[in-house]
Curated annotation (Swiss-Prot):
Protein activity control: Small GTPases activation is mediated by guanine exchange factors (GEF), while inactivation through hydrolysis of the bound GTP is stimulated by GTPase activating proteins (GAP).
Sites where the protein binds Mg(2+): 29, 70
Tissue: Expressed in most tissues.
GO cellular component annotations of the record: COPII vesicle coat; endoplasmic reticulum exit site; endoplasmic reticulum membrane; Golgi cisterna membrane
UniProt: GTP binding residues: 30, 32-35, 129-130, 132, 177
Family: Belongs to the small GTPase superfamily. SAR1 family.
UniProt-listed Pfam families: Arf
Descriptive protein name: Small COPII coat GTPase SAR1B
Gene Ontology terms for molecular function: GTP binding; GTPase activity; metal ion binding
Compartments, as annotated in UniProt: Endoplasmic reticulum membrane; Golgi apparatus, Golgi stack membrane
Organism name: Brassica campestris
Main location: endoplasmic reticulum
Amino acid sequence: MFLFDWFYGILASLGLWQKEAKILFLGLDNAGKTTLLHMLKDERLVQHQPTQHPTSEELSIGKIKFKAFDLGGHQIARRVWKDYYAKVDAVVYLVDAYDKERFSESKKELDALLSDDALATVPFLILGNKIDNPYAASEDELRYHLGLTNFTTGKGKVTTAGGDSGVRPLEVFMCSIVRKMGYGEGFKWLSQYIN
């Protein structure tokens, strides 16, 4: 019973209670995708090898169904991202906010995702990770380098009128997965757009 209550608390706090969702975790290698997935699954922080093959985690408790796909971020793994776009409910795109030298590469991949017709109406949560590092980019700096200044939809509820408004929910949240900061707010925001 304790385990059920614990999982309920985690998912309810993320706004995913009584919802079913297929979520892709994307981003360059070393951005924190696998670490985030394991923190969401069992609040465990462990060292991970780079993800070589796509993995998925499915949590199902009561009426909660949450399926997350962790697709590797290295250049070869990015080639299979497109294979997972079908019937996806949301994309969580992670960026290493400390690795400023890779911002242009991350922007290129994000631009490709945002311009793909298969993802045209899919909400995007962009997480700037590793803000526990004092030299990590600020939210404004990350928005600028990703070309998202004045492009995001806001951290409040965006009215999408049943998906007909042409507005794709897209927002940036800064986080530190290892310190368990910021990503919860991002998932609460994202949950508004998962039916």
